[in-house]
Amino acid sequence: MRDKIQQIREKALAEIDKADGLEKLNDVRAAILGKKGELTAVLKGMKDVAPDERPKVGQWVNETREAVEKLLDEKVKKFEAEALKRKYESEKIDVTMPAKRSKKGNLHPVTQVKDQLSEIFTSMGFEVYEGTEIENDYYNFTALNTPKDHPARDMQDTFYLSPEFLLRTQTSAGQIHVMEAKKPPIKVVSPGKVFRSDDDATHSPMFTQMEGLVVDKGITLCDLKGMLDQLVKKMFGKNVTTRLRPSYFPFTEPSVEVDVSCFQCHGKGCSLCKGTGWIEVLGAGVVNKKVLEGCGIDTNEYSGFAFGIGLERIAMLKYGINNIKLLFESDLRVLDQIDDN
């Protein structure tokens, strides 16, 4: 019996030694130590061994099992270490290789226009005021010479949150807050999002506006025209000129629409200016006396002008975008082409 156990031991150790992988080791383990393994068969045959020999046979079997298991464990650890080393080698990062360059991001076209306009206006001495998007009906309409029964309220489809509060339809509401908080002279621009129930190729339910207000002694429409001339030259080029057309806004009198000479065809007529040679860019006017008086400003001493610029409109003109929805779709194929830097 001892010779048989010794043969099993030598055979197992030899096969373990020449095994070339974990799969082969598992085969050896099953063949020697498994339920149907050779060493297990010896234990099952103990009933045929003389009683006085059984302790010795059991000892030989246990010694063989321990030797086989020890060598198996050592070989398994060796193969696992080699596999881990190969994995590390395959995944190793060569730190000397050039890295992939990060893609340069651009500011959104509307943000670029907002920053450009803010820089132009601050260079002219304007302060920047940030208003609130949820506004009181009084500041959005009533204080701007548009009381509840005024037909001019129908000029804008408004998102009401309650009978008293709404999503502001114009940054003009910021004028009232500023005039209530400050005494003239006042020179301020107020950029921000506004909300109207509009949705087509040139309008969006949410868009960005920049309101401007100047209040001081002796302010006239001529001052407005001079400021606008400087603005468009800095924004669109020194050869661009402006013209004023009569219009109507309840909070200015007189009111004007401001056009710029087409910077694409230079007045000859093209698709951008629809053959007219002029492009509408903003609305403006002399602040209505009722608006000033409502804020406690003496209209015998002070006057002012105001203007409102749609930033998406300027971005579309400046960057040749023909549909306002492209500014809200986050399409990198469009946005990657626009970078003033």
Swiss-Prot record:
CDD domains: PheRS_alpha_core (cd00496). It catalyses: tRNA(Phe) + L-phenylalanine + ATP = L-phenylalanyl-tRNA(Phe) + AMP + diphosphate + H(+). GO terms for biological process: phenylalanyl-tRNA aminoacylation. Binds 2 magnesium ions per tetramer. Its cofactor is Mg(2+). It is found in: Cytoplasm. Pfam families: Phe_tRNA-synt_N, tRNA-synt_2d. InterPro entries: aa-tRNA-synth_II, aa-tRNA-synth_II/BPL/LPL, Phe-tRNA-synth_IIc_asu, Phe-tRNA_ligase_II_N, Phe_tRNA_ligase_alpha1_bac, Phenylalanyl-tRNA_Synthase, tRNA-bd_arm. Tetramer of two alpha and two beta subunits. Belongs to the class-II aminoacyl-tRNA synthetase family. Phe-tRNA synthetase alpha subunit type 1 subfamily. Its main location: cytoplasm. It comes from Agathobacter rectalis (strain ATCC 33656 / DSM 3377 / JCM 17463 / KCTC 5835 / VPI 0990). This is Phenylalanine--tRNA ligase alpha subunit. Keywords: Aminoacyl-tRNA synthetase, ATP-binding, Cytoplasm, Ligase, Magnesium, Metal-binding, Nucleotide-binding, Protein biosynthesis. Its EC number is 6.1.1.20. One of its GO terms (cellular component) is cytoplasm. GO terms for molecular function: ATP binding; catalytic activity, acting on a protein; magnesium ion binding; phenylalanine-tRNA ligase activity; transferase activity; tRNA binding. Mg(2+) binds at E253.
